[in-house]
């Protein structure tokens, strides 16, 4: 198909502004109106929409109130660190706002009962369990192109097995096959994701690089492409246990914003993930309230506006659970002090988990 060729403009007869207008007009005739424009002409480019993560602290750490729409996000971490839980919370928050969500379960490990406990509406959730990596990414591409999906979760990159690997024998070597598959898929997806305003969340696993003597040996699967295309990368880790007397009832979790293209990165936030409940919003509210001097902590006692909430964290959480009006008041006060809290979350680029997701080595294909 023949395309218009830009013509040279005589500088003597037309100034630079007219030359620019002529060039823009020619581009629009060739590729359609809106193919080129000044940034100020489209307010949506400047104002980035977001979807809450279900964690008050993480929303503040991300700088825009949640994960950005129309972008690619990567959540990675060790096993049982809360990657899928965090992704399902995003799905639940999107559904609360009337959004349509899809879950591509490449690991074939989706637990609908747990998802329902986190607040996910199973009746409105599209779920696919593809056989191959190519099939999973093709399904993702089709859903994004429809323009009807608000959040799409792919769990996980490590489980996107190329067809050639599935059809081959167990001992066959397929070096770089998954990395090439991811690179090709992301090249196709990135433009469509932006136009459809869909949030794509890739969940990823951690592997160890072979022969690393200095620095962090951790890396993520699927090659380097996802690291470049992702606007936000979250490193999630389990750092301890939450106990009720002697019984372990949850995990203490730390999330580091390793990469952020829409706000300053390197913020670190900690929250509890309770078994059968998910992210503990009330526990997070207490911690952030103390940090912002909204809640006073004296010894084991928590107080708000001279009212004692409870002795010990679990008792204080139960008090807020029984008094939703006070909990909402504290949440609003915390959100009003988001800027102050965000400044205290800065962890810096250095740390034990920096290089996780570095260049994938040959050993990572295993």
Curated annotation (Swiss-Prot):
Alphabetical list of CDD domains matching this protein: RecA
Major location (coarse): cytoplasm
InterPro entries found in the cross-reference section: AAA+_ATPase (IPR003593), DNA_recomb/repair_RecA (IPR013765), DNA_recomb/repair_RecA_CS (IPR020584), P-loop_NTPase (IPR027417), RecA-like_C (IPR049261), RecA-like_N (IPR049428), RecA_ATP-bd (IPR020588), RecA_C_sf (IPR023400)
Function in brief: Can catalyze the hydrolysis of ATP in the presence of single-stranded DNA, the ATP-dependent uptake of single-stranded DNA by duplex DNA, and the ATP-dependent hybridization of homologous single-stranded DNAs. It interacts with LexA causing its activation and leading to its autocatalytic cleavage.
Disordered: annotated segments: 346-366
Name the record gives this protein: Protein RecA
Pfam assignment, any one: RecA
GO biological process, one term: DNA repair
Entry GO MF terms: ATP binding; ATP hydrolysis activity; ATP-dependent DNA damage sensor activity; damaged DNA binding; single-stranded DNA binding
Lineage top rank: taxon: Bacteria
Taxonomic path: Bacteria, Pseudomonadati, Pseudomonadota, Alphaproteobacteria, Rhodospirillales
Gene3D superfamilies on file: P-loop containing nucleotide triphosphate hydrolases
Binding of ATP, residues: 77-84
Family, per entry: Belongs to the RecA family.
Residues spanning the signal sequence: none
PROSITE patterns: RECA_1, RECA_2, RECA_3
Subcellular location: Cytoplasm
């Amino acid at each position: 198909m023949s395309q218009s060729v830009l013509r040279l403009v005589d500088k003597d007869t037309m100034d630079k502004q007219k030359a620019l207008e002529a060039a823009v007009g020619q581009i629009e005739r060739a590729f359609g109106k809106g193919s080129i424009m000044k940034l100020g002409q489209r307010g949506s480019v400047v104002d980035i929409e977001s979807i809450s993560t279900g964690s008050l602290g993480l929303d503040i750490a991300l700088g825009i109130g949640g994960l950005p729409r129309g972008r690619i996000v990567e959540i990675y971490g060790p096993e049982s660190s809360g990657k899928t839980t965090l992704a399902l919370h995003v799905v639940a928050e999107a559904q609360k706002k009337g959004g349509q969500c899809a879950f591509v379960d490449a690991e074939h490990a989706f637990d609908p009962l747990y998802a329902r406990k986190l607040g996910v509406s199973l009746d409105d959730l599209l779920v696919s369990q593809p056989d191959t990596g190519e099939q999973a990414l093709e399904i993702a591409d089709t859903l994004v192109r429809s323009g009807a999906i608000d959040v799409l979760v792919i769990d996980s990159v490590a489980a996107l097995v190329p067809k050639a690997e599935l059809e081959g024998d167990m001992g066959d070597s397929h070096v770089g096959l998954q990395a090439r598959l991811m690179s090709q898929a992301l090249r196709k997806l990135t433009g469509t994701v932006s136009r459809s305003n869909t949030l794509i969340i890739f969940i990823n696993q951690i592997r160890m690089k072979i022969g690393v003597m200095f620095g962090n040996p951790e890396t993520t699967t699927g090659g380097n492409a996802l690291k470049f295309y992702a606007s936000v990368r979250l490193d999630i880790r389990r750092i301890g246990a939450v106990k009720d007397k002697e019984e372990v009832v949850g995990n203490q979790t730390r999330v580091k914003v390793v990469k952020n293209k829409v706000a300053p990165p390197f913020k670190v936030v900690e929250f509890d993930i309770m078994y059968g409940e998910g992210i503990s919003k009330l526990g997070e509210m207490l911690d952030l309230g103390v940090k912002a001097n909204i809640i006073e902590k004296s010894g084991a006692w928590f107080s708000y506006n001279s009212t004692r909430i409870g002795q010990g964290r679990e008792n204080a959480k139960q008090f807020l659970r029984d008094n939703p009006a006070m909990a909402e008041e504290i949440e609003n006060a915390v959100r009003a002090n988001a800027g102050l809290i965000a400044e205290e979350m800065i962890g810096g680029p250095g740390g034990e988990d920096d290089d996780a997701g570095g260049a994938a080595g040959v050993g990572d294909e295993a």
